[in-house]
Amino acid sequence: LPVFAGWVLSYDKPILLVLEDQCHLERAVRYLIRAGYDWIVGYLKGGVEGFYNAGFPTEHMELLTVHQLKAKIDRGEELTILDDRGQDEWDQGHIKGAKHIYVGHIPERMSDIPKDKPVAMFCNVGHRAGLGASILLREGCREVYNVLGSMTAWKAAGYPITTE
């Protein structure tokens, strides 16, 4: 939360926290206030599960394994692979043909990302890719995938990477 809040939150909009366990509430509020986010209007009791159980409408992102991603690449499917890792991670190796935009820069680089074509989000293990995918969905991208395990799983599967 302390690292990612600045990438996705706005100081001029109310914040509703979604926490699986209320014991994390005080710490989350403290982190946000220290970062200058003080318009915290409440929290969702019961977390996401409570939201589901109440019958409210939800959205979700699709998940891909690295094997499914590799199959899409091999079939030549139209797909943007968006790697949102840091520059040093990218330089150590990435999927050939992937586009690199650091997760914190995605909101300001939306014009570089096709909203009407599939995008597979990729990072080191999937956490930042999930955040990046959420940003893309919020910004109107229609078909967004979070690649489970991302680079860690890609390497474990023995799939090729490049440093070019």
Language model regions located:
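Rhodanese-like catalytic fold shared by cysteine-dependent sulfurtransferases
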Residues: L1-T80, D84-E164
